[in-house]
């Protein structure tokens, strides 16, 4: 049989997938460290006991206990909540539900979380960027100029990796600019560290507002892969049309419901208080470290800092088993490294290693 016209497996793939650069998650980048401060995880494990043993049956698409517990915690109605495999799936669901490949676009404001771009590219949806201003706030004029053909605008607040909140008045202006034109997705993955800044109370005013949440950060359940989308019922019903039939396994739903119990939420708030205390300790120490040029304000469980020689610092700590997140390739973040707030022992190891660096 002739093989002249036979395509390779790669040739059979969609062109945009062949050209896709996958998201470089902390785990994908690897490393052989014993101090992992590169993925904004909680530094110690939380223990749960599995109570659901009926693993021979398929789980509910939207487990009732999880939905009701999260709705009560977030101060919304159960009909306004969708649970998914992490907030990353929520990003993809919104794009799939609202964007026509080859026709519509998403918009985001770098430097910010990389999965908005990767999800859109995977789905064949155009990506538009409006870089943040020098203070990392929204360029509202730039966004306004790019709304024609844009169906979804992603805003991360507090923003990853910079750590700051987006000005609430700017968010209101954005929601007014996009009313009747586009969905606005507010990524609140880190909102537990600044709960006063949540936009959940705005859902009644803005039918096109969507909020993303996760159990990966303050709830210390990054390995669970459980996230939430909060929106008005009309939006949730559209997302339910495109979600997989069984997004959460029975053990995941079991643990998530426990984490969202009154006891679980109290434990989360204790972890937040502990993290905020350690964050201030780390900020103070970094500000007194010679190789650190600037420490940026943070409303999260991580700190962004600019270094005099970030590449050599990153490699030096990597070689010592201290794994940070290099942000040099992000727009306007030259010389910056992101440091997750760890335990006191981990934070001290970072400081000791940095103070041993040549200046």
From Swiss-Prot:
SUPFAM superfamilies: PLP-dependent transferases. Keywords: Amino-acid biosynthesis, Aminotransferase, Histidine biosynthesis, Pyridoxal phosphate, Transferase. Its cofactor is pyridoxal 5'-phosphate. Its EC number is 2.6.1.9. One of its GO terms (biological process) is L-histidine biosynthetic process. GO terms for molecular function: histidinol-phosphate transaminase activity; pyridoxal phosphate binding. It catalyses: L-histidinol phosphate + 2-oxoglutarate = 3-(imidazol-4-yl)-2-oxopropyl phosphate + L-glutamate. Pathway: Amino-acid biosynthesis; L-histidine biosynthesis; L-histidine from 5-phospho-alpha-D-ribose 1-diphosphate: step 7/9. It is an enzyme of class 2 (transferase). It holds the Pfam family Aminotran_1_2. Belongs to the class-II pyridoxal-phosphate-dependent aminotransferase family. Histidinol-phosphate aminotransferase subfamily. HAMAP family: HisC_aminotrans_2 (MF_01023). Homodimer. PANTHER family: HISTIDINOL-PHOSPHATE AMINOTRANSFERASE, HISTIDINOL-PHOSPHATE AMINOTRANSFERASE-RELATED. This is Histidinol-phosphate aminotransferase. It comes from Salmonella dublin (strain CT_02021853). The gene is hisC.
């Amino acid at each position: 049989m002739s093989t002249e016209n036979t395509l390779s497996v790669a040739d059979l793939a969609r062109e945009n997938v062949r050209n896709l650069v996958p998201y470089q998650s902390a785990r994908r980048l690897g490393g052989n460290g014993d101090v992992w401060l590169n993925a904004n995880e909680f530094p110690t494990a939380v223990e749960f006991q599995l109570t659901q043993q009926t693993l021979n049956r398929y789980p509910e698409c939207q487990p009732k206990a999880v939905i009701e517990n999260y709705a009560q915690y977030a101060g919304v109605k159960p009909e306004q909540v969708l649970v998914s495999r992490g907030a990353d799936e929520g990003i993809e669901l919104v794009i799939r539900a609202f964007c026509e490949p080859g026709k519509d676009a998403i918009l985001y404001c770098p430097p910010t979380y990389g999965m908005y771009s990767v999800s859109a590219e995977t789905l064949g949806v155009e990506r538009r960027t409006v870089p943040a201003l020098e203070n990392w706030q929204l360029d509202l004029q730039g966004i306004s100029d790019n709304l024609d053909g844009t169906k979804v605008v992603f805003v991360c607040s507090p923003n990853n990796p910079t750590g700051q909140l987006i000005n609430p008045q700017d968010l209101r202006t954005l929601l007014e600019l996009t009313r009747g034109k586009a969905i606005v997705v507010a990524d609140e993955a880190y909102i537990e560290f600044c709960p006063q800044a949540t936009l959940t109370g705005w859902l009644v005013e803005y039918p096109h507002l969507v909020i993303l949440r996760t159990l990966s950060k303050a709830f210390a359940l990054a390995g669970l892969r459980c996230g939430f989308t909060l929106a008005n019922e009309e939006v949730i019903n559209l997302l339910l049309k495109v979600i997989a039939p069984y997004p959460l396994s029975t053990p995941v739903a079991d643990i998530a419901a426990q984490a969202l119990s009154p006891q679980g939420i109290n434990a989360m708030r204790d972890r937040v208080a502990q993290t905020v205390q350690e964050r201030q300790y780390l900020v103070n120490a970094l500000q007194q470290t010679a190789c650190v040029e600037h420490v940026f304000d943070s409303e999260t469980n991580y700190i962004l800092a600019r270094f005099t020689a970030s590449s050599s610092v990153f490699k030096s700590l990597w070689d010592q088993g201290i794994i940070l997140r290099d942000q040099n390739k992000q727009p306007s973040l030259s010389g910056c490294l992101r440091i997750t707030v760890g335990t006191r022992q981990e934070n001290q190891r970072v400081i000791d290693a940095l103070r041993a660096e040549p200046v």
